Amino acid sequence: MKMTPAKALALFACACSSSAFAQETKNNSTSGTKPRALARIVWQDSSDPTLKWSDVTRGSDGLSIQPQAVAGFPKLDGEKQSFVQMEDSNGIVVVGIHDNDNGQFQSGWVALSSGVTEEEHGDHSHWHFDQPPSILASKLDQEQGNPAHVYNYQGDIFLANDKKNGFTLLTAAALSKANATTTADSLARFYAGGGGHITLAAVDRQVCYATWMDRDGENQGRVDVIPLDINSPGKGYSLKLPSGGLHGATANSGRIFFAPSDGIDWVEADVGLKQRPDSVKINHLSLGQDTATGKPLRTGAFTNHGSHVLFTTGTKDSATLCIIDAKSSEPVVNKISMPIEEGLAWTTPACVRTATGKQYAFIFGDRRDSEVAESLSIVDLDPNADGNFSDAKVSKKLGVGPSKIVGHGGHHEVAFSASGRWAFIANPGDGTIWAISLSSLEVDSKTKVGGTPSRMVVVGG
């Protein structure tokens, strides 16, 4: 195959970079200088529960992770409180906190700076790890409604306040200016909308769709459409989807996707709130039927990757990875068969575009009341690189350490470096974090960090 000058130059630059890095590593090991940080990981340790962090460095002995507690993180009661989801917005991490008393003990959120800064250089960035993580603000009391789901839409962080039938918005603008003197109230804004176990989908910082989980009654299939402009209170409306039990919502390419008890429903995003409940066209995508129960197949969570929406459904031989091209004129469900052993269930996909342009979905086979060996499947989403994911297929399957599932927590987790060179996976059951090279898809290192590492974010790298 003929090599173009551009490709030859890229390969030469890569070789020079690798050679320089190898020499730097050698110099570090002989001179005693501090190893260069490749990325920073922040993770939840549910054994305490505490928030931990470490820079990932490479020395003569390979990758190194040295766990430390985040200084100033509020002390949680492990018997009464637990972590829920967390999100990163340009280096600021927001962590949700749940309690076991319907929010009447202390629930809410904590915002912290990762301590990592980005120096952009056109087609790449340099990352600086000069400061440790620091707490910016927190809100833990009896008024936060026991959040469970945390989302990042366009850099804004949304927390679903289940017991208050509403959600909290922490805007990207406010987060970007946050510092040690920031007050929680200056960051957060509450909106009424949604009910029960709420899921959220927001578009263009203008509108948010908030679901109700009711399976019957007057709120079955209800979705509240809420304006985010504080100058437009009371101008929203409510939709009614064909089926209830809503658990899952996302926004992609100007469309909103929902996960009810039957398949997938979607609507065009009403950013200007110009429609009425009876004028909204509700579109339905069937996922088929569960062969064991005869009930319609469903999902419980979505992942966005570019203009694609990914999720899993089914069990055992009928287990499937589903992909929807959200920008298509007529969205359909592209199904990739992924049979799974009895006693395991696929997790929600986590997606990455690597430094070389490959696109992968990482999906764990986690235990469901069984002792079956767990695994990680890595799906090549676009083997022929034509932008169409219809040829997606499992590229690699790896054994992993054990999970330690309690409620919604304790699943395997994965997060990726910003450069698309590394994946880091947490094995809650044996207290390890593994690093996987995204060029070889092989495990590069396994580090015992102790405790029960679970949800994580990676900043920089």
Identify the residue ranges that each predicted region occupies.
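Repeated scaffold domains used in trafficking and secretory/extracellular systems
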Residues: 28-32, 75-90, 134-153, 189-205, ...
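Short coil/turn segments that connect the beta-strands within blades of beta-propeller domains
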Residues: 37-39, 90-92, 154-156, 205-206, ...
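Post-signal peptide N-terminal segment of secreted/secretory-pathway proteins
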Residues: 47-166
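Structural motif
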Residues: 49-55, 102-112, 164-172, 217-224, ...
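A short beta-strand motif characteristic of beta-propeller blades
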Residues: 63-76, 125-141, 177-192, 232-240, ...
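Acidic, serine/threonine- and glycine-rich low-complexity intrinsically disordered segments
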Residues: 203-352
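Loop/turn-rich, solvent-exposed surfaces of beta-rich toroidal or solenoidal domains
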Residues: 346-421, 425
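Blade-level signature of beta-propeller repeat domains, shared across WD40, Kelch, NHL, RCC1
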Residues: 426-461
